[in-house]
Amino acid sequence: MSTVPARIEPVAPLAPQAQDLRCFNTLGLASHAPAFVALTEPSQLPALSALAPRFRQLVVLGGGSNVVLPASIDGLVAQVRLPGVRLVGQCADAWVVEAAAGENWHGFVTACVDNGWDGLENLALIPGTVGAAPVQNIGAYGVELADRFHSLTAWDVKGGRWVEMGAAECRFAYRDSFFKHQEPGAWVIGSVRFALPRPWQPVLDYPDLQRHAALDGAAPTARAVYDAVCAIRRAKLPDPAVVGNAGSFFKNPLVDAGTRQALLGRFPGLVSYPQPDGRYKLAAGWLIDQCGWKGRQLGAAGVHDRQALVLVNRGGAQARDIMALAAAIQGDVERRYGVRLEPEPVVVPAR
């Protein structure tokens, strides 16, 4: 972790205003922020550091695709909209590409594929922004952000400084990172750099992906993998613009080999995936489906009828409805399998 030399530039002012957040979260939950600011340039970050102590809490938003927002937020909400994508450099074994935190993640992946900067195609169509991606260490179809990560710059809100972090400082794990264990609002990611491998090799660990990416027996290209991932996700997952959702709501639980073997003895159809450390990742969607939750509804919240991992807003849902449904699912899964499901989204407190 190293401090980035301060840039000499004027401090852009921030003037908080009230904001309806219904369109700022993909679950479409009714939420109100009495104090809201949009961060559109790095020079605004010092002003954010000066402003934040006046409020009970600082809530940093990206695309709002991995959050559960309360009806009202007692604090300052800052949405990161920093723009920009550039090729930083290239060497024999990698392209180094940088994207600002406010860039749409899928748009960034598409730009990389279009430019021949291959390696992120398995992560296509994941909602959200570039800045939120390292926080969650997003992953799909055999690739995690950590696999392609180079470094990032983040603003230390209390310290009032830019800090550069490598993979070791970010402490990536399954859907986890350093940032998820810090005080909320302590850091604002400004930009992320990716090391995209040269030569490129496809990652086709999932059977669905193998079938979709095969083109007349020819070796798949990054574009073919990208198209396959998009097709699979569109077939399985609801569009947040049509049905409010936050993508996969639960992490796939990790268990040791003994626990997995005991579960297989009772449930022969158990879906699991071996991990490099000897543990097994259980398919949370399968566990939920087997408990009979797929397609069910509890109040204004429901479980998607094609993907049991996805909780949806059936219209007018609030945070309490989503969390009540999540708790009911967790209880049923734990009673049947002895496994506790952990939610993926950040649940923002009202205060």
Curated annotation (Swiss-Prot):
GO cellular component: cytosol
UniProt-listed Pfam families: FAD_binding_4, MurB_C
UniProt keywords, alphabetically: Cell cycle, Cell division, Cell shape, Cell wall biogenesis/degradation, Cytoplasm, FAD, Flavoprotein, NADP, Oxidoreductase, Peptidoglycan synthesis
Pathway connected to this protein: Cell wall biogenesis; peptidoglycan biosynthesis
Keyword Cell division on entry: yes
GO molecular function annotations of the record: FAD binding; UDP-N-acetylmuramate dehydrogenase activity
Cell location: Cytoplasm
Gene Ontology biological-process annotations: cell division; cell wall organization; peptidoglycan biosynthetic process; regulation of cell shape
Function description: Cell wall formation.
Family as reported in the entry's similarity comment: Belongs to the MurB family.
EC number(s) given by UniProt: 1.3.1.98
Protein name: UDP-N-acetylenolpyruvoylglucosamine reductase
Cofactor(s) in the UniProt record: FAD
Class of this enzyme: oxidoreductase
Active site (catalytic residues): R175, S248 (proton donor), E344
Reaction(s) this enzyme catalyzes, per UniProt: UDP-N-acetyl-alpha-D-muramate + NADP(+) = UDP-N-acetyl-3-O-(1-carboxyvinyl)-alpha-D-glucosamine + NADPH + H(+)
FAD-binding PCMH-type domain location: 29-199
